Amino acid sequence: MSETMLEIKDVHKAFNPGTINEKIALDGVNLTLEKGDFVTVIGGNGAGKSTMLNAIAGVWPIDSGSIRIGDTNVTGLPAFKRAALIGRVFQDPMTGTAATMQIEENMALALRRGKPRSPFKPGVTHKERESFREKLKILDLGLEDRLTAKVGLLSGGQRQALTLLMATLQMPKILLLDEHTAALDPKTAEKVLAATEKVVSKDNLTTLMITHNMKDAIAHGNRLIMMNEGKVILDIRGEEKAKLTVEDLLHKFSSVSGEEFASDKVLLS
């Protein structure tokens, strides 16, 4: 029997409501993710992708509807009370790690986040160090041999891969990836996406990954959703997704929305 890890029901969110600048960001969004679902999210600027992730994380309170993460109704909870349920990686590789601290120190902080700290506990225990080394091997970036290196010495791709790993150390109910490869060059982005697949697959993590690249959205995950004007207009999975091409996706968008997809909104290749 499958386990529901995320349930979004009829969620609405507007910015500047009742003014001439009113913007409907989420317009009745419904989405359910089961344990292990890896869902890629595509859509143009202003489609509602990041607003949806912010609503899940509690950054923006929603106007109506409900959100459940695992068994917890988080609809009215502030972000800090949802933090233990969520792992999140943002677009900027510099924001997820402390540059002046060592790799193992960053990982130790992520592992102990939200837990009571003992003044007698060493910075990083031998057991933690060995665990970190094994986890870093999964990334295949050689970081397992550089545990005491300052994070500021790493490349942007290495830092983003490390941030990804840190976001999963406490086994969150859901992992939110908000265009986490957008600031990287194509070759580095490919490496980070490969690392993402490994980390998500190893721990069977339930994941929502926003991407601005249609090919990446098609190539990764077991489901693809497309958003437009605050709505989920496509939800493609299984064999249909496995056979999907960029041309198919553009055609489906046009059929559902009644308009052509503006190619400047995302990368088609």
Task: Kindly give the residue locations of the regions a language model identified.
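H-loop/switch region of ABC-family ATPase nucleotide-binding domains
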Residues: 211-212
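Conserved ABC transporter NBD signature motif
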Residues: 65-73, 234-236
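Helix-to-loop junction immediately C-terminal to a conserved catalytic motif
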Residues: 57
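A short, flexible loop at the N-terminus of ABC-type nucleotide-binding domains that lies
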Residues: 2-5, 14-28, 78
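ABC ATPase NBD coupling module
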Residues: 19, 73-87, 95, 118-125, ...
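Conserved beta-strand-loop-alpha-helix hinge in the C-terminal portion
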Residues: 231-257
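The feature captures the beta-strand-to-loop junction immediately N-terminal to the Walker
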Residues: 42-44
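ABC ATPase C-loop
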Residues: 167-168
